[in-house]
């Protein structure tokens, strides 16, 4: 993993955050801890879900987790950073260019209108598990994987009581206990 590129990413987020709202985090230390370190800790052992895969970060915003995943797993075949806000997409394009992220693009699109199909999807802070899974049904290839990053299991319990439980099989949970709890929830599309 390229630590100098991670540092550059943190600096890019902090600088852009002074001009428009990318995150509530202000210092480089906070940005590193909550955007970079958490993602590395949550995903570091799951390279097989990204190796030579077509990946999308839904509601990418400041590029977390997509940019960090591309730096952690440079062997990702293609990465689409998708957001509906032009300012954020322009920021993501700057990040892609500055960090020289190959086979990565930032797309200004509404997820419900996007038609590409992916092996792996990631979502952090976009919506509830049920809402994002509704998009994932269309965007994931058969047997594709979606990773949700949440702060509690409440939304997972709602998923368990929904009609979607037949469409997605939970694979695993991974907990990260830093200053705030983060939970990685991996699900496989059954359809």
Curated annotation (Swiss-Prot):
EC number: 2.1.1.-
MF terms (GO), sorted A to Z: rRNA (guanine-N7-)-methyltransferase activity
Residues noted as binding S-adenosyl-L-methionine in the record, renumbered to the chain: 59, 111-112, 124
Subcellular location: Cytoplasm
Enzyme class: transferase
Function: Specifically methylates the N7 position of a guanine in 16S rRNA.
Protein name: Ribosomal RNA small subunit methyltransferase G
Species of origin: Mycoplasma pneumoniae (strain ATCC 29342 / M129 / Subtype 1) (Mycoplasmoides pneumoniae)
Lineage, opening ranks: Bacteria, Bacillati, Mycoplasmatota, Mycoplasmoidales, Mycoplasmoidaceae
């Amino acid at each position: 993993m390229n630590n100098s590129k991670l540092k550059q990413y943190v600096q890019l987020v902090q600088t852009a955050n002074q001009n428009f709202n990318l995150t509530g985090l202000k210092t480089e230390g906070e940005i590193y801890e909550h955007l970079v370190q958490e993602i590395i800790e949550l995903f570091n052992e799951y390279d097989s879900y990204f190796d030579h895969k077509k990946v999308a970060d839904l509601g990418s915003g400041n590029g977390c987790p997509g940019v960090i995943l591309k730096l952690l797993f440079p062997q990702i075949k293609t990465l689409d950073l998708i957001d509906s806000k032009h300012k954020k997409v322009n920021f993501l394009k700057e990040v892609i260019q500055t960090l020289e992220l190959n086979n990565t693009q930032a797309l200004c699109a509404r997820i419900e209108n996007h038609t590409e199909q992916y092996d792996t999807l990631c979502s952090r802070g976009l919506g509830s598990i049920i809402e994002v899974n509704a998009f994932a049904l269309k965007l994931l290839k058969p047997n594709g994987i979606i990773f949700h990053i949440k702060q509690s299991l409440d939304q997972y319990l709602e998923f368990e009581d929904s009609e979607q439980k037949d469409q997605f099989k939970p694979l695993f949970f991974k907990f990260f206990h830093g200053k705030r709890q983060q939970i990685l929830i991996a699900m496989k599309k059954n359809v």
